[in-house]
């Protein structure tokens, strides 16, 4: 017994002694990384050219802007960043909902059922109603704007008769009034592939339809948790109203969505049946993106985060993908989505997206897994240089697809590098 005790003490001391050496080695790697400077410069170059999601998109999307507004703050004046946010508030729905994106009205086309507002005649808006992240994305974007610029005057700006502060709360009220399921105490949306905005039942799949299968997933609810935290920091006088809501959503995510046995989030809770065959075991699928956002929302312990990144690394190995940006593993089988782009390992069904992989890197750094973060960052920054751009997604064979100037990818990698540099600075001061 005593021998085992002393062996345990010795092992603990050895681990403690090796940590400074490990950090020192990592700091050297960060400071001499052959890709980081290139990626930072390329990110600034790409973001200077505008605010649409990428060269394949005409619209400014709030879910994308949320991931590169801090990068944009490096090159644009505050009023330019603020104006983009104000467009979303001017186009807010009568029930408080927030659009996905906007485009100059004269360029509106391409099949969307466009939304117009008297408060903002210059633009046409659209909303992929299968998703439930637009409102949360706008709250997070305003928070990041205030953090990046120090300008909280936006909260008092008016769009019509309401201030931005009032409209932020209204958007959260929309989710509670129109997207909240009483039975589970969580937000719902359509069935999609993790964070995706394509449902299985339609050839395009971005709108709720009569044959939609309504479901609850971790991504929407984790985004809501982050938004509520941001809202309470922006508007501390409203904390009494929103703290109980945050606690309810947090507890119910753990209660209903976390699979303790398998140490993963279940893909969906179905409210009225699944769109998939009865003999399909959907819980075999591991959602990478939703897990990363859940970590950002504080839903997982250190041990659970460790298990999560280990599972992601194993999934990359099993799939042959290039990085932990892999949306999920295994993907949904052929034919499960009517949209032809959602084939196995295609687009949101198992494509490799730096846009979400980079968010996992950020959370690993913030949760003291900097070594693992650095390791998993390398394939993401390498392919930026190899392909001279920030591509939207990559195939399982690491081939670039989609927009080559995908600003969300640029934003998350740029921020991850900032966090690595902060890690180096803080450890140098110790």
Listing of model-derived features with the role each one plays in the protein:
Residues 14-15:
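C-terminal motif of bacterial Sec signal peptides marking the signal peptidase cleavage site
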Residues 48-67, 73-75, 120-133, 206-223, ...:
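Solvent-exposed loop and edge beta-strand segments that line ligand/cofactor-binding
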Residues 58-86, 90-186, 218-221, 351-373, ...:
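Aromatic-rich carbohydrate-recognition surfaces in CAZymes
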Residues 111, 185-205:
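Carboxylate-rich helix-loop segments that flank metal/cofactor sites and access channels
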Residues 425-430:
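Long, intrinsically disordered, low-complexity segments
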């Amino acid at each position: 017994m005593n021998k085992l005790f002393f062996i345990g003490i010795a092992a603990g001391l050895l681990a403690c002694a090796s940590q400074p050496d490990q950090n020192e080695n990592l700091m050297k790697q960060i400071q001499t990384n052959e890709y980081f400077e290139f990626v930072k410069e390329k990110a600034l170059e790409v973001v200077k050219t505008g605010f649409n999601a990428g060269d394949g998109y005409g619209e400014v999307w709030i879910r994308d802007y949320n991931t590169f507004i801090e990068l944009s703050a490096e090159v644009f004046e505050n009023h330019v960043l603020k104006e983009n946010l104000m467009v979303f508030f001017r186009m807010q729905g009568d029930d408080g909902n927030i659009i996905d994106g906007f485009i100059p009205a004269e360029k509106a086309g391409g099949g969307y059922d466009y939304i117009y507002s008297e408060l903002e005649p210059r633009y046409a808006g659209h909303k992929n109603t299968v998703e439930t992240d637009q409102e949360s994305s706008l709250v997070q974007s305003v928070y990041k704007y205030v953090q990046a610029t120090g300008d909280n005057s936006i909260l008092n700006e008016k769009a019509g008769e309401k201030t931005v502060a009032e409209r932020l709360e209204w958007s959260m009220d929309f989710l509670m009034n129109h997207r909240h399921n009483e039975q589970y105490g969580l937000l719902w949306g359509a069935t999609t592939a993790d964070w995706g905005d394509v449902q299985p039942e339609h050839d395009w799949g971005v709108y709720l339809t009569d044959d939609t299968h309504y479901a609850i997933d971790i991504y929407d609810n984790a985004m809501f948790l982050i938004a509520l935290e941001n809202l309470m920091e922006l508007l501390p006088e409203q904390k009494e109203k929103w703290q109980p809501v945050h606690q309810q959503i947090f507890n119910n995510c753990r209660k209903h969505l976390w699979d303790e046995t398998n140490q993963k989030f279940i893909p969906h809770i179905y409210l009225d049946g699944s769109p998939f065959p009865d003999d399909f075991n959907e819980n075999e699928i591991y959602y990478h993106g939703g897990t990363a956002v859940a970590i950002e929302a504080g839903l997982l312990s250190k041990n659970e985060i460790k298990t999560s990144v280990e599972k992601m690394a194993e999934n990359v190995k099993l799939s042959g993908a290039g990085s932990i940006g892999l949306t999920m593993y295994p993907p949904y089988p052929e034919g499960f989505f009517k949209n032809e782009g959602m084939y196995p390992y295609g687009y949101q069904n198992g494509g490799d997206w730096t846009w979400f992989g980079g968010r996992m890197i950020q959370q690993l750094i913030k949760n003291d897994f900097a070594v693992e973060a650095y390791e998993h960052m390398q394939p993401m920054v390498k392919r930026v240089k190899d392909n001279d751009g920030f591509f939207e997604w990559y195939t399982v064979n690491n081939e670039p697809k989609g927009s080559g100037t995908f600003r969300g990818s640029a934003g998350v990698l740029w921020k991850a590098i900032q966090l690595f540099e902060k890690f180096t600075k803080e450890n140098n001061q110790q």
